[in-house]
A protein has these predicted regions:
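Long, leucine/valine-rich, helix-dominated scaffolding and oligomerization segments
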Residues: 6-11, 15-28, 174-433
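Signature of Asx- and small-polar-rich beta-strand/turn repeats characteristic
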Residues: 28-177
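Short, low-complexity N-terminal tether/leader segments at secretion or assembly junctions of large
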Residues: 1-13, 146-155
Length: 436
């Protein structure tokens, strides 16, 4: 699994506002791919981003024309280490060169090519170069890789979709109605967004989606979570406190299986909201229904978003926390809750990072954090771990957006502090080390 973290302040990142469609754009460009441009001469460009994101879109040529001057550019607001290709027509022949911008020139990028030269579907991976720098391509400044042919192919491959975040746009219907499918190794479930809200949008999960309607009622789907009986109209995904063009800070962390969306709807970094959709690290062998959906419970931003809250196993449920099915794999959507190292935290129903140990710990100068677990509330059953999300065992020990590197059992992992509502703080894991 590969994870990537994108912030609103990154170069070329999309803008989140209190206007319709803005969250659809953010998720398109973070969960799938930000930009895909084709060119035959590095002067005129064709924007193939929409086609590249969509499973059902119109296939496009990998190279606009079958000449050595043709290039395909793939860009993201931050560095990335993979691109997955689904081909409509496989290539025949050709030699391809991958390159990145090192600050002064396009330089060869050594890749592991899972497509075998675009003769099959697959993922191309690489180690992120230390000298990788942003540059402008078609007036968009961000991190780019480019693909060109030193020997032109006999058959130019055509591409159904390409994804960097690992997800794909599975369906497209009316404007601002969208659905994305989880990627490789996941349950393959659907995140369905009703993106026509202003300050907030509504969302549900589906196990399968056949037809995307202009409203939730128009969808042809199975396995909705939460069900309409549990939560009519879907959970609330907050964008902004005002229905206008004011840009709001946000952070997206995404792997093939799960994504986090943090939105600072007031631009104050004190009462921000957090949203999660995807597969947890399940403790059940063969679990096919461990996909969660956590967001807000009412139209009021912040106060009813409980993503940072923890409870004791068997204690009261957390609002707007759902999973597709219980551990028996039977039935429909269930309510879930989260817990962590409550003994050190000093309470059994406290937002993470809102109390606990002295920081730094006076004995060893340590910053303590704990894994977050997901449990089924009806029978006090621990289902698994929540990837990428950690609980500080101190009272807001760090400044918002501070970063740090773990030690001991957490060596090699990096983290970012995120301030939330009710004096809470959570740690987002920013390295490609999520538990899966």
């Amino acid at each position: 699994m590969t994870s990537i973290v994108i912030k609103s302040t990154d170069s070329g990142a999309p803008t989140l506002t209190g206007q319709t469609g803005s969250l659809v754009t953010v998720l398109d460009k973070c969960l799938v791919v930000n930009h895909v441009f084709g060119t035959s001469d590095d002067v005129g460009f064709t924007d193939q981003s929409v086609e590249a994101r969509s499973e059902g879109g119109t296939p496009f040529n990998l190279l606009l024309t079958n000449v050595t001057a043709a290039r395909l550019y793939i860009g993201m607001p931050t560095t990335f280490s993979r691109a997955k290709f689904d081909l409509a027509t496989v290539g025949v022949g050709g030699t391809y060169i991958w390159e990145y911008w090192n600050g002064s020139a396009w330089t060869t990028l050594t890749v592991t090519d899972g497509t075998s030269g675009f003769t099959a579907d697959g993922t191309v991976t690489w180690t992120i170069p230390s000298l990788w720098a942003t540059t402008a391509v078609n007036a968009v400044t961000q991190y780019w890789v480019r693909i060109r042919a030193s020997v032109t192919p006999g058959t130019n491959p055509t591409v159904n979709f390409v994804t960097v975040g690992g997800w794909t746009r599975s369906h497209t219907a009316a404007t601002n109605q969208a659905a994305w499918r989880q990627g490789t190794g996941s349950n393959g479930f659907i995140f369905r967004l009703v993106g026509d809200g202003t300050t907030q949008d509504r969302a549900v999960g589906y196990e399968t989606l056949t037809t995307l309607g202009s409203t939730l009622a128009g969808d042809t789907a199975t396995g909705r979570f939460p069900t309409d009986a549990q939560f009519s109209g879907g959970l609330y995904w907050t964008k902004s406190s005002t229905a206008d063009a004011t840009a709001r800070p946000w952070v997206v962390a995404v792997s093939e299986k799960l994504f986090h969306l943090y939105t600072d709807h007031l631009s104050t970094n004190t009462t921000a909201t957090h949203h999660i959709f995807g597969d947890i690290k399940t403790f059940k062998t063969g679990d096919a229904y461990h996909t969660i959906h956590i967001a807000g419970a009412t139209v009021t931003p912040g106060s009813t978003n409980r993503a940072a809250d923890l409870v004791a196993v068997g204690a009261a449920v957390l609002t707007a926390h759902f999973m597709s099915r219980n551990y028996t794999q039977l039935g429909t959507s269930i309510i879930i809750s989260k817990h962590s190292d409550a003994a050190k935290l000093g309470g059994i129903s406290t937002p993470m990072g809102a109390g606990g140990l002295v920081f730094p710990n006076p004995i060893d100068g340590g910053l303590y954090l704990a894994q977050v677990y997901v449990h089924e509330t009806s029978a006090s059953i621990v289902r698994g771990e929540l990837p990428g999300f950690w609980a500080p065992l101190h009272s807001r020990p760090l400044t918002h957006l501070d970063t740090f590197t773990g030690t001991g059992t957490l060596a090699g992992r990096t983290f970012m502090a995120l301030n939330m509502y009710n004096s809470a703080q959570a740690f987002l894991e920013t390295s490609d080390t999520w538990n899966v």
